[in-house]
Amino acid sequence: MQREEKQLEACLDALISQVSDIKNSLVGFIHKLENEYDRLTWPSVLDSFALLSGQLNTLNKVLKNEKTPLLRNQVIIPLLLSPDRDEEIMRLTEGRVPVFSHEVVPDHLRTKPDPDVEELEKQLSAEAARITSEAAQKQVQSMNKMCSNLLDKISKEERESELGSLRQNKQTFNPTDTNALVAAVAFGKGLSNRRPPGQGGPMAPGQTGASSMLPNATGMQVPMSLPPNQQQQHMAGVSMSQGSQPGKMPSSIKTNIKSASMHPYQR
């Protein structure tokens, strides 16, 4: 018997502590709503709700614990009723109950709801009993359909929001390539100083002049049969052009290209 009494006392102490924490959280939240509503933010409200939810879950765990005795089996009986002011009750109830008389006992030790609430519950129970099973099934199906449509809309909005955030955060360029291009254009980083052959400048040993640019120029030579006077004039023009530029190598590519262009279809 003493063991059960100790367990009951420990359970009551734990419940009083949990309820006191919940009460303090509620008082602080109500104070914010009444006095700090102008600068109250939504994250702060969510934090307050999360704190209250966690404390209520802890209280439920204490009540459902195996070591917690069944409080419903315990009976509370007032041993003394007095119309006089009781300071101890004032301290325990924080000034809310000054006396413990016949007027307040039915309210504070009530095991049933208030009469108004009890009457409303009876009306709702009577209305639920009058509904047929078919009508109730239709109402349930209608409610399920509405909930499904609402869930679909919420899921669609969530997907669209995620896709929009992905489009905004998607990177459309490579930072490495961009930095390399900027460095090449601004500072010439990574560019080669060599010139391609045939673009001017001194030629390396072993390289020829224009013949290196046109490797198939020799294949463009086409035998021509010209009259003797035109052939002499043609050869004289070539010799004059070669003689007018002393110190340069004679170029036959110009003549060959010219002759090829005059008869493109001759084989």
Swiss-Prot record:
Family matches, as InterPro entries: Mediatior_Med8_fun/met
Subcellular localization(s) per the UniProt record: Nucleus
GO cellular component: mediator complex
Any single biological process term in GO: regulation of transcription by RNA polymerase II
Source species, domain of life: Eukaryota
Compositional bias per record (Polar residues), positions renumbered to this chain: 227-245
Annotated region (Disordered), positions in chain: 190-267
A single MF term (Gene Ontology): transcription coregulator activity
Pathway recorded for this protein: Protein modification; protein ubiquitination
Major localisation: nucleus
Pfam families xref list: Med8 (PF10232)
UniProt family annotation: Belongs to the Mediator complex subunit 8 family.
Protein name: Mediator of RNA polymerase II transcription subunit 8
Species annotation: Xenopus tropicalis
